[in-house]
Amino acid sequence: MIPVCRLEDLPKGESVRIETTRPVAVFHTDDGELHAIDDTCTHQDASLSEGWLEGCLIECPLHAASFDLRTGMPTCLPARRAVRTHRVTVDDGVIHVHLAAEEGTAA
């Protein structure tokens, strides 16, 4: 379990990148949901935390590949492989990421 930041410090519609062995991006959607995925686009090495968030979709800033934050699945080309998703919890106002195992997509 990795502490990220206080919930109040991550506004809706924003994201934050955390440095782990493989960087992780945490997103706070306009609907108030929290999602975490590997931060690197599976098409090319672009940071998804720098992409455009719309609903539960994140668009890669490099070639406009799009991923569903809930599943990690790509929703359009050029990406063909999913990004790994991670479980997110909030404890005492602090966002935590529970890293998924190397195999599979969800923690």
Regions found by a protein language model. Name each.
Residues 41, 60-63:
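Short cysteine clusters
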Residues 1-55, 68-69, 82-107:
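N-terminal pre-ligand scaffold of iron-sulfur
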Residues 55-61, 74-83:
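Short cysteine/histidine-rich metal-coordination sites, predominantly Zn2+-binding motifs
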